[in-house]
Structure formats: structure tokens, C-alpha cells
């Protein structure tokens, strides 16, 4: 094990995860999720987040189809998708996705199709940004472990 390389990777990991919180991508729920991961379940967070991203993709696609026809929008179906997306984003600590869902729900409540389309575009953008950033984070974790190090705990508060 090269302790200098491990220390650099760990520092990079800590800085990166702090930046994700500072930029509003993540909230404390992500920290709580990370606490559930241990040596027996080393990929727990990555697996949960992967399921979240799969759900996001499906929900965004379903809502997009529901909003396609301007004369026949099923706002109840869109609202149901927004509700599911908000719940799952809250459970993994995807703060920006969750925040867009709040605005999205307001647009559904007043049956504002244009507002819903804007929110759909924004939630798709935020989910894709977060996916890229968390993939980078998980790759950094793998590099640390492959170098013989341990994943550092990061105190965000």
C-alpha cells in the first residue's frame, strides 16, 4: 500500500463529497445512508443509488409521455410520478432533485402544463448531473479501496 497515494485519494474524496453538499446536490440523508454501509455490505450505497437512478429514468420517461399531448394531459398521473420521485430523492439525499419536485408538484396542482414541462426538463437535468457526480464519487471510493485504503467518514455538519 502506498500511503501517500491513499492519503491523497482520501483527501480528494473528502473534498469532493463536501463540495457535493456545498453545491446542494446532497443533504444529510445521504450521510445517513452512508452510515448504513459497512464491510459486510461495501456496495450498499452504490446499489441503493443505482436503484434510485433507474427509478428516476422510468418516472421521467412516464411523466414525459403523460405531458406530450397538450389537449389531454393526465395531471394525476404526472403528480403521482412527481410524488414518487420526491419520496425516493428524499430517501437518498438528492436535495436538488427533491427541490425541483416541490415546484413540479405546484405546477401539477394548478394543471400548468408549461410549468410541468419546465420542471420535467429541470428534474431530468438535475438527476443526470447528480448521477455523473455520484459515479465519480463511487469511482474514487473504488480507487481508495484498490490502493489498500479505507473510505474516510466525512463530517458535513
Curated annotation (Swiss-Prot):
PTM annotation (Phosphohistidine): residues: 83
Protein keywords: Acetylation, Cytokinin signaling pathway, Cytoplasm, Nucleus, Phosphoprotein, Two-component regulatory system
Domain of life: Eukaryota
Gene Ontology BP annotations: antipodal cell differentiation; cytokinin-activated signaling pathway; embryo sac egg cell differentiation; phosphorelay signal transduction system
InterPro entries on file: AHP1-5/YPD1, HPT_dom_sf, Sig_transdc_His_kin_Hpt_dom
Domain HPt: 41-148
Record's subcellular location: Cytoplasm, Cytosol; Nucleus
Modification after translation, per record: Two-component system major event consists of a His-to-Asp phosphorelay between a sensor histidine kinase (HK) and a response regulator (RR). In plants, the His-to-Asp phosphorelay involves an additional intermediate named Histidine-containing phosphotransfer protein (HPt). This multistep phosphorelay consists of a His-Asp-His-Asp sequential transfer of a phosphate group between first a His and an Asp of the HK protein, followed by the transfer to a conserved His of the HPt protein and finally the transfer to an Asp in the receiver domain of the RR protein.
UniProt keyword Chaperone, yes or no: no
Keyword Cell membrane: no
Gene Ontology CC entries for this record: cytoplasm; cytosol; nucleus
Tissues expressing the protein: Expressed in the whole plant.
Gene Ontology MF, one: histidine phosphotransfer kinase activity
Ranges in a coiled coil: none
Pfam families the UniProt entry points to: Hpt
N-acetylmethionine modification, residue list: 1
Written domain comment of the UniProt record: Histidine-containing phosphotransfer domain (HPt) contains an active histidine that mediates the phosphotransfer.
Record function comment: Functions as a two-component phosphorelay mediator between cytokinin sensor histidine kinases and response regulators (B-type ARRs). Plays an important role in propagating cytokinin signal transduction through the multistep His-to-Asp phosphorelay.
Oligomeric and partner information: Interacts with the B-type response regulators ARR1 and ARR2. Binds to AHK2, AHK3, AHK4 and AHK5.
Protein name, per record: Histidine-containing phosphotransfer protein 5
Gene expressing this chain: AHP5
